[in-house]
């Protein structure tokens, strides 16, 4: 029995009336076990094993996993709605891009009409200018040829005429001079002959006289030489120079002037040129190209959204990803919940067995009631605290370590920690879904990036088809011009060559007719051949070159006439920010932004939940750190001695003996320890530490003494039953 001095109880019996000395009094008597109500094995005021196992299906971890599953289901439902909205926006944006692309791909249809008109007008003016230029060239060439022929013919006709006339004049002068000399010579010779004959006649006349005198006067007559008449006849001979040069004078009058050759050549050369001019004028004089023969590019209706199932397939893939993730989590999380139920069931069975064992130990021995309650309610964390505290030798540190573990594993702290883990696990599940969606997003971006390429490819194809058809028309016109106009030029050059050959033949005939039987024939022929024929051959070579190269090559349309600008824009040559100039910033932003919004929204939700879960985890860490700091501070405080009112922390484990007073030598009497039975040691004995009294704080309560003990100044030492 105990009493309180302040309540007016009967004071204790003085010590001098006690048979034993105070040394024999056990200041810490064995605790008196309190009787408890009788309980049947099947009817108890507490939950038995079956009752506890019946509540395993809604244990803490299962409930948290179910909450995570509910969060995932809510997320997938929201994702399906968001993906549906994104699909609608993407299809709308894709349709807009499709309309823009169709309009751009149809631009050749509208541009080709103007290009055809411009090309037709250019061809008309080109042909008209070519006709005018050809007419001027033909006229110029014709007159140039005639000028050269006239120059050659006139020059050499004058040279030949001068040569002939000069030769004839020389011949006439020579004949006249020779005739005069001969006539003068005949008169002189006749006079000299007459004088000589007169002298001879005088001599002959003296001969008879001499002979007569010599013969004595015989007279005889000698015949007289009379040649006077003959000399008169000889003197009367006159050479007429006119008769001698009559043929030469007649030849001089018959020298040709080549007018016939010139006129013939002029008429012959004019024939092909006039024919060519008439053909050119009749065919291309009023030429106008018909632009209707040019093709018109067809309109293009791009359908990379309408007929292309990529977008639908992409979003169906996203729906399938969400559906698969939903099914996976609906399967995995319940499995984890079942495993949690199984694990918690196993732990509950172990806890039940451990509680039954400890209840017997707690019943058979005296322990700190609070420690008993704690170890009974928290066997796992309490056991972990016992295991960890056994590593320290100081009893106080052992108590503080156990207190720290108990503080950090209290129900509120573990509730915060479980919420943090559940939130992080939920974020992990959402992150898995996010990564699955992000993995599919680049495929959409790549496909959208190809839309611009599809437009440019269509433009290129349309441009190529139109250019091929238009170039076919131009090539046909080019062939017509080469076959008609320049074919006539070829014919004209051939005719001119033939005419020049005829001209050469006519000149040769004229020279032959004039100089055939004269000594000037070869000279005149060689002179004309050197000065005229070789020049004609040179002109013929030029006409042959014209004949071989008389064709025109019209410029053709390039295959990228309508797509070059678009292609340059896609390749980055344009500074414009347009569908083609920057497809990544326009097309991708228009279409993929819908998916990016879903991803961004999901990311923001994950980040928010992760921050909340991290905040809860930090709260738990702060709680643990505050408990650890409090334990460290308590461990560092200087302890009071027992005489100063200090506290005794705990007792030795059951079965271990405390040392007795050295002076008494009686091992059965202890001042501060209980007598305990050494039988049936528990796991607490092996750990070397048990319960321990609580560290006192606050205002101390009234002191108590046993009714059989005298009042003493020693403070009462609390036993484990207090």
Swiss-Prot record:
Source organism per UniProt:
Chaetomium globosum (strain ATCC 6205 / CBS 148.51 / DSM 1962 / NBRC 6347 / NRRL 1970) (Soil fungus)
Question: Transmembrane segments in this chain: where?
Answer: 61-81, 144-164, 327-347, 414-434, 605-625
Q: How does it sit in the membrane?
A: Multi-pass membrane protein
Gene Ontology cellular-component terms for this entry are:
mating projection tip; plasma membrane
Q: What is its main location?
A: membrane
Q: Which residues are glycosylated?
A: 252, 263, 281, 307, 491, 497, 567
- Residue spans of biased composition, Low complexity class: 655-667
Q: Which family does it belong to?
A: Belongs to the PRM1 family.
| Name under which the protein is recorded | Plasma membrane fusion protein PRM1
- Tell me which UniProt keywords the record has, alphabetically: Cell membrane, Conjugation, Glycoprotein, Membrane, Transmembrane, Transmembrane helix
Q: Which gene encodes it?
A: PRM1
Q: Which residues lie on this side of the membrane: Extracellular?
A: 1-60, 165-326, 435-604
Query: Which cellular compartments is it found in?
Result: Cell membrane
Q: Report the superkingdom from the record.
A: Eukaryota
Biological process (GO), any one: plasma membrane fusion involved in cytogamy
Q: What does this protein do?
A: Involved in cell fusion during mating by stabilizing the plasma membrane fusion event.
Region listing for Disordered, in residue ranges: 636-722
Identify the residue ranges that face the Cytoplasmic compartment according to the record. Answer: 82-143, 348-413, 626-722
